[in-house]
């Protein structure tokens, strides 16, 4: 618990909602773009756009069953995007097998050192289960993606534990 709290203290906190946000890519196969405004749909519109499972996870902060996600064992090279708004979120280059049952990444796409200001994600404190965790949401549409924990591999020490159903994979072009 102390390790988690120390890790939380050193993290960048939320940007104000509604501000223009950068979601720039980095180099090879750049899939980033400047996001000019936050995507906001009604509950009914999200339900029309998404499958019931996608809606439950991304809009109601649900969690898919462990070891059930379609991207858990995906080893293709490419980019993982938000299933709701198509923002680039995680590169396959930062994906690893954590053994937890969900796709895991060591950092978000666009991270520069410890600076996540050019990524497609935001972190939010989640105390819903009675112990503090760091929720990961999409900057563009605020979709719940999963959580990040301070028990990942070097050099970041982070484990972004992300629901497959919240992602859309786009393979790199040859």
Curated annotation (Swiss-Prot):
It is an enzyme of class 1 (oxidoreductase). GO terms for molecular function: actin binding; L-methionine-(R)-S-oxide reductase activity; peptide-methionine (R)-S-oxide reductase activity; zinc ion binding. GO terms for cellular component: cytoplasm; mitochondrion. It is found in: Mitochondrion. It holds the Pfam family SelR. Residues 62-172 form the MsrB domain. The active site is at residue 161. Zn(2+) binds at residues 82, 85, 138, 141. Its EC number is 1.8.4.12, 1.8.4.14. Residues 1-61 form a transit peptide. InterPro entries: Met_Sox_Rdtase_MsrB, Met_Sox_Rdtase_MsrB_dom, Mss4-like_sf. Its main location: mitochondrion. Transmembrane segments: none annotated. Belongs to the MsrB Met sulfoxide reductase family. Methionine-sulfoxide reductase that specifically reduces methionine (R)-sulfoxide back to methionine. While in many cases, methionine oxidation is the result of random oxidation following oxidative stress, methionine oxidation is also a post-translational modification that takes place on specific residue. Upon oxidative stress, may play a role in the preservation of mitochondrial integrity by decreasing the intracellular reactive oxygen species build-up through its scavenging role, hence contributing to cell survival and protein maintenance. This is Methionine-R-sulfoxide reductase B2, mitochondrial. It comes from Rattus norvegicus. The gene is Msrb2.
């Amino acid at each position: 618990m102390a390790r988690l709290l120390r890790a939380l203290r050193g993290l960048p906190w939320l940007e104000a909602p509604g501000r223009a946000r950068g979601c720039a890519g980095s180099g090879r196969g750049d899939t980033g773009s400047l996001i000019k405004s936050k995507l906001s749909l009604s509950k009914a519109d999200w339900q029309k756009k998404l499958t019931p499972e996608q809606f439950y996870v991304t809009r109601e902060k649900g969690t898919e069953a462990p070891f059930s996600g379609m991207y858990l064992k995906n080893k293709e090279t490419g980019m993982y995007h938000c299933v709701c708004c198509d923002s680039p979120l995680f590169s396959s280059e930062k994906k690893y097998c954590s053994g937890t049952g969900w796709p895991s990444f060591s950092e978000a796409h666009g991270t520069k050192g410890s600076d996540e200001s050019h990524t497609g994600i935001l972190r939010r404190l989640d105390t819903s289960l009675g112990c503090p965790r760091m929720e990961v949401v999409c900057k563009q549409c605020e979709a719940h993606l999963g959580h990040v924990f301070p028990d990942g591999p070097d050099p970041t020490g982070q484990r972004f534990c992300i629901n497959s159903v919240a992602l859309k994979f786009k393979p790199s072009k040859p």
